Amino acid sequence: SNARNYTYCFDPKVRASLWVAYPLHSAYTSGSGNRNYSDFGYDPKVDDELQAALGRGSYNGWYDRGHQIPAADRKCSQQMMDQTFYATNMTPQQGKFNQNKWGVLEGRVRNMICSDTLYVVTGAYFEGEHDSSIANKTTDKSANNCPTPTYYYKALLRTKKGNTGKTINEISDANQLRAIAFWLEHADTGNDTNITAADCISVAELEKRTGFTFFPMIDDAIEAEVKRAAVPSEWGVN
């Protein structure tokens, strides 16, 4: 299929994508895709030598091959699920963090799916990335250095009602949209699964921290207002 699955911003300096952007809807989260039939491997759209070598196992140390777009977000077909196992979608993620707090956040995001499309950007922030001084690193199975992210984030955008039948760029009233971002320190969080308001920031603040501009499809006249707002309770977070 030539349908777009997701979009990523790959940085060969860290052998990982700085962000992965994708639409989310119930059409994507149900179907025949089965992760038991998916294999970790290279992304055919990027030179192999630029990617982490993950086909023979995970990163060395206590790191999982952490998905940015979760496999569970692409059950609609085996092909789309398989693509979530490409190395360009992976980062070295602390095992406890991945399996507990981050995994809970991924599930929370799926619970925010509505009839209109939910737009998601998942990202990894590497402190020191721009001056090549990233202190924390691991290696892959080919002994390539793989920096470990300092923070992970998710940015979300959808309509408030969830059933408008409109695309984002058709909406000219900021009160019809809601946006938020989650910013989590990448650490061994043990069995902690709590997502709280302290983990939430505005999309505008996320843009300041990362240097990226998210959700360009928002009408320019309302973009700033939408991105400044961040109401955790609207997203089931206290």
Go through the PLM ranges and name each one.
Residues 3-68:
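Short, His- and charge-rich active-site/binding loops that engage polyanionic ligands
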Residues 48-238:
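Domain-level detector of nuclease and nuclease-like folds
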